[in-house]
Curated annotation (Swiss-Prot):
<feature type="glycosylation site" description="N-linked (GlcNAc...) asparagine">
    <location>
        <position position="110"/>
    </location>
</feature>
<keyword id="KW-0134">Cell wall</keyword>
<dbReference type="GO" id="GO:0005886">
    <property type="term" value="C:plasma membrane"/>
</dbReference>
<feature type="glycosylation site" description="N-linked (GlcNAc...) asparagine">
    <location>
        <position position="587"/>
    </location>
</feature>
<feature type="glycosylation site" description="N-linked (GlcNAc...) asparagine">
    <location>
        <position position="717"/>
    </location>
</feature>
<keyword id="KW-0701">S-layer</keyword>
<feature type="glycosylation site" description="N-linked (GlcNAc...) asparagine">
    <location>
        <position position="557"/>
    </location>
</feature>
<feature type="glycosylation site" description="N-linked (GlcNAc...) asparagine">
    <location>
        <position position="838"/>
    </location>
</feature>
<feature type="glycosylation site" description="N-linked (GlcNAc...) asparagine">
    <location>
        <position position="490"/>
    </location>
</feature>
<feature type="glycosylation site" description="N-linked (GlcNAc...) asparagine">
    <location>
        <position position="523"/>
    </location>
</feature>
<feature type="glycosylation site" description="N-linked (GlcNAc...) asparagine">
    <location>
        <position position="616"/>
    </location>
</feature>
<dbReference type="Pfam" id="PF18204">
    <property type="entry name" value="PGF-CTERM"/>
</dbReference>
<feature type="short sequence motif" description="PGF sorting signal">
    <location>
        <begin position="899"/>
        <end position="901"/>
    </location>
</feature>
<keyword id="KW-0961">Cell wall biogenesis/degradation</keyword>
<feature type="glycosylation site" description="N-linked (GlcNAc...) asparagine">
    <location>
        <position position="574"/>
    </location>
</feature>
<feature type="glycosylation site" description="N-linked (GlcNAc...) asparagine">
    <location>
        <position position="847"/>
    </location>
</feature>
<dbReference type="GO" id="GO:0071555">
    <property type="term" value="P:cell wall organization"/>
</dbReference>
Length: 922
């Protein structure tokens, strides 16, 4: 008996067979629709508006222009696309129909042809989605090379190998080979066709290919890359994951410009949503903006087609979701700063790009400023900068700003404070708490803000000043080096400054950031240095009474001017090349650097090496717009002549050994971090030489130069002097030097156990005294301990206490060091370099096993108790109990595996049931 479902299935199959019989008269995409026994085997548009239909038989009678209808993108017989003529030979009766259009069809268009008036049966044939080619290659014209972009569809017109295109048959072969002769395509022409459509998508860019038709005619095709790119860009739209209030847009670029391109937006069902046509620009982005799109049809993608070549590219998927209710909040509900500073207020946004912020309250504070924020970069937050120094002035664009990619519009100040403050000379906002609020959206009328917070403006003050020194060639404002990273390298705290070095005044003061910001953004200062000098009064009133509006003052005065004379201040206008300011407003810190070589005082005098100069630097915020109470800090320092002094031995010589790694040291007052040279020159006939090793000044003013004297003989004399940063030889006195037999040392250390607090060196010999240092790991490892000063001589079983106990095994490297500065204190690194032999440090190494001390009573307890208990109890219990318990244990183990076994049986049962059900159905 046939079931109902089988009956339905039979009816469906019967209907499908009947439908397939009639389907022969219905159009087929890209190919054939039948009219009687005639169908289209291939269709192509080529050669600027020529259309070929290759039929499987004759149309019976010639096709005329009136028998042909043209559809472009679904539009019937559009203007400019009329059929101008039908080929007199290939009029359909030969099985080939060729006709010409009034206008070339671009490769990006959809072309459909309907031919009627055929004899016999249904008299209409339709060819849909015809291949529209961008270039035509005539294989018999020997035209040479054809340049094509990868992805173009080409038409290759045949000649059958006999020089006459009419001779092409279905056996005519077309072969495409690469430059190495490898065949990439081998095919034949369709019956009744003289045109072969060839897609270049799979060819390699930069390659040349040879086309052979019928075995004789050749044509070369060179493939280039159009480099058509469709990118989802946050700069022009809102990205790949957006909501229905965001902008859907793409950036399109190509290597060739000037040609139009068609951009089509498709939804998740591949339905066309919108189309735009724009001309592309070579290597420049062109934006296609499709505005807001519905979340219902998400995801979307954009397909862009170059109209001339037909080359296409698609964007990645763009997801559109429904927008939720927008909200805005503050990252921190309470923000604190000082009056006069620039305060950062970070606003966070959800489901919105816009928010309105209010700082202050017109009712409570008599001042409010409002602005509309836009999250242009789509990161969900906008940082607002509020300048309390300029608040209330006419130019409110300096009060509320937004840095970076985000945007700020519709800024407006209100309140009696704004009405009364007409210039920066008048008082700024009072130090107190101000309300702040933010609301999602763009409406300025805020009655119920999303979030309310507090801005606490405290009183400003000058906290401290101290001076640092830097080398004369230091580039203080180098953006690649953080000024704090210089500390300990080439920035050292000191009140003794060598002439030509840089003195850096570190000022810690709050409430001055806003004035500097105003000078840079609105008053023409090119950088923070210009802004600082413009904002601060640098000249006493007795010289110039043009005080600054901010009340900031920086006086740097020479004080050693003698009796009955005023201090001589630096003329900052004439010393502009000497001044550099580096600001750190987040920490209320400002570094004002002065190059002492270029400083000029109001008297016209400069800082010279002929005499010491005493200077008093004072920074203050005077009573005025920024504060009701003045505050200031000062620092005294002295400049002195640059000098260096070499360290000599007891005989008054700079003495080195005839070996590698010899050191020459000295002391100087120039800034630590300065790069000096020590010049050593011998005019000896036997051993003439000039050596100039470099030496870096250390934090304590010492410097050490290291040189190899192993090629020179003991007994050679030389002269030595220290050269300044600029190579100046007058920097130090010239001293006498001599080469003596090289100092020697030996050391021996063995593998050992230790509690980690000390190591024992077996033996050591130091020809000139010094120290034994212990390095961890290898010779370049950290020094973890050193001996006391050792006189010249030999030592055995030398115990060295480590700086910190070691808690695990390590390799100890023993290394003898010299006492190069003669102070009998270990000063390495810097001074006290190691003894060397053949250019390498003298060392020996050993493995140190760190072990804890074992408790004394543990070994005694273990043997007394355990042997006595075990034989008495265990043998009696084991035979009696264990045999009876073991079977139970085995049973329990089997049961423990039961659930897994049951699951396997259940699975088999299910399979069996399924097979039984199938059998019953059959």
């Amino acid at each position: 008996m046939t079931g109902n479902s089988d009956k339905v299935r039979s009816l469906f199959l019967t209907a499908l067979m009947v439908f397939s019989v009639f389907a022969g008269t219905i159009a087929f995409s890209g190919g054939a629709a039948a009219a009687a026994n005639v169908s289209v085997q291939q269709a192509a548009e080529y050669d600027s508006g020529t259309v070929e239909l290759a039929l499987n038989g004759s149309t019976g009678s010639p096709v005329t222009t009136g028998d042909i209808n043209i559809y472009i993108d679904g539009n019937e017989n559009p203007s400019n696309y009329g059929v101008s003529s039908v080929d007199t030979t290939d009029d359909g009766t030969t099985g080939r129909l060729q006709f010409s259009l009034d206008q070339d069809v671009q490769p990006n268009r959809n072309l459909t042809v309907e031919v009627s008036g055929l004899t016999g049966g249904d008299n209409t044939v339709v060819a849909e989605d015809i291949d529209v080619t961008s270039q035509t290659i005539d294989a018999d014209d020997d035209s040479g090379d054809t340049n094509a972009f990868r992805g173009e569809v080409l038409a290759i017109r045949a000649d059958g190998g006999e020089g006459d295109a009419d001779d092409a048959t279905s056996s005519t072969q077309i072969v495409v080979e690469d430059s190495n002769g490898a065949v990439v395509t081998q095919d034949t022409y369709t019956a009744n066709s003289k045109v072969y459509t060839y897609e270049t998508e799979n060819l390699d860019t930069g390659e040349e290919y040879e086309v052979t038709v019928g075995g004789t005619a050749d044509e070369n095709i060179t493939i280039s890359n159009l480099d058509l790119n469709v990118n989802i860009d946050d700069d022009v739209g809102d990205g790949a994951n957006i909501d229905d209030t965001d902008t859907l847009a793409v950036n399109v670029s190509t290597t060739r410009g000037g040609e139009p391109a068609n951009a089509t937006l498709f939804n998740e069902d591949d339905d066309k949503v919108a189309t735009q046509i724009k001309s592309l620009k070579g290597n420049e982005n062109v934006v296609f903006d499709f505005g807001n799109q519905s979340a219902d049809d998400s995801p979307y993608y954009v397909k862009v087609t170059d109209n001339q070549t037909g080359v296409s590219a698609e964007s990645d998927q763009i997801n559109v979701s429904e927008s939720g209710e927008g909200d805005a909040s503050f990252e921190t509900s309470t923000v604190q700063d000082e009056v006069g500073d620039v305060t950062n207020i970070t606003v966070q946004m959800g489901n919105t790009e816009n928010a309105v912020i209010n700082v202050g309250s017109q009712n409570d504070d008599n001042y409010v400023i409002q602005g509309q924020l836009e999250d242009d970069n789509g990161d969900g937050e906008v940082t607002v900068q509020f300048n309390s120094y300029t608040a209330g002035t006419d130019n409110n664009n300096t009060v509320l700003t937004v840095p970076g990619d985000d945007d700020l519009d519709e800024v407006e100040e209100k309140g009696s404070f704004t009405d009364s403050r007409n210039s920066l000379d008048e008082d700024v906002l009072e130090p107190q708490s101000y309300s702040i609020n933010v609301t999602a959206g763009t409406s300025p009328d805020v009655t119920s803000p999303d979030t309310v917070g507090t801005l606490r403006l405290n009183e400003n003050s000058v906290e401290s000043m101290q001076t640092w020194v830097a080398p004369s060639d230091a580039d203080i404002d180098d953006e690649d080096i953080d000024i704090y990273d210089r500390i300990g390298e080439n920035l050292t705290q000191s009140d003794d400054v060598a002439v030509e070095d840089v003195v850096v005044h570190e000022i810690q003061a709050s409430g001055i950031e806003g004035a500097l910001e105003y000078e840079q953004e609105d008053n023409g200062s090119s950088d923070v240095t210009d802004a600082f000098i413009a904002a601060a009064d640098t000249t006493p009133d007795r010289i110039n009474d043009d005080t600054s509006a901010s009340g900031l003052q920086l006086y740097v005065n020479r004080t050693d001017v003698g009796a009955n004379a005023d201090a001589d201040p630096i003329n900052f206008a004439n010393s502009s090349s000497a001044v550099t300011v580096v600001d750190d407003p987040d920490n209320n810190t400002y570094f004002v650097a002065l190059d002492t070589e270029d400083v000029e005082f109001e008297s016209g005098n400069t800082i010279t090496e002929e005499e010491d100069t005493e200077i008093n630097a004072t920074f203050s915020v005077q009573e005025g717009p920024l504060t009701d109470d003045s505050s200031s800090e000062s620092e005294l320092y002295t400049t002195s002549e640059r000098n260096a002094e070499l360290n000599l031995d007891d005989d008054g010589f700079v003495t080195v050994g005839a070996a590698a790694g010899q050191t020459v040291s000295g002391d100087t007052n120039v800034a630590p971090g300065s790069e000096l040279e020590v010049e050593m020159e011998s005019e000896s006939e036997a051993n003439p030489f000039v050596e100039r090793p470099e030496a870096t000044v250390g934090p304590n003013g010492t410097y050490v130069a290291t040189e190899d004297f192993s090629d020179y003989s003991a007994g050679t004399n030389f002269t030595v002097q220290t050269l300044d940063v600029d190579g100046d030889s007058d920097f130090s006195d010239e001293e006498d030097g001599r080469i003596v037999e090289a100092d020697t040392a030996t050391v021996s250390i063995s593998d050992q156990e230790s509690d980690g607090s000390e190591v024992v060196v077996d033996s050591a010999q130091l020809s000139s005294g010094g120290f034994i240092a212990i390095h961890a790991g290898d010779a370049s490892g950290d020094v973890v301990g050193n001996s006391e000063y050792l006189e010249a001589g030999t030592y055995n079983d030398l115990t060295i206490t480590l700086d910190e106990p070691m808690d695990e095994n390590f390799t100890a490297v023993a290394m003898p060091h010299q006492d190069t500065n003669g102070n009998e204190e270990y000063d390495f690194p810097g001074d006290d370099g190691p003894y060397t032999q053949n250019g390498s440090a003298v060392t020996d190494s050993a493995n140190v096993t760190v072990s804890a001390e074992e408790p004394e009573d543990t070994p005694e307890d273990t043997p007394e108790d355990t042997p006595e208990d075990t034989p008495e109890d265990t043998p009696e219990d084991t035979p009696a109990d264990t045999p009876e318990d073991t079977p139970d244990t085995g049973t329990e183990t089997t049961e423990a595996e039961g659930p897994g076994f049951t699951a396997a049986i259940a699975l088999i049962a299910l399979v069996a049931a399924a097979l039984l059900a199938v059998r019953r159905d059959n």
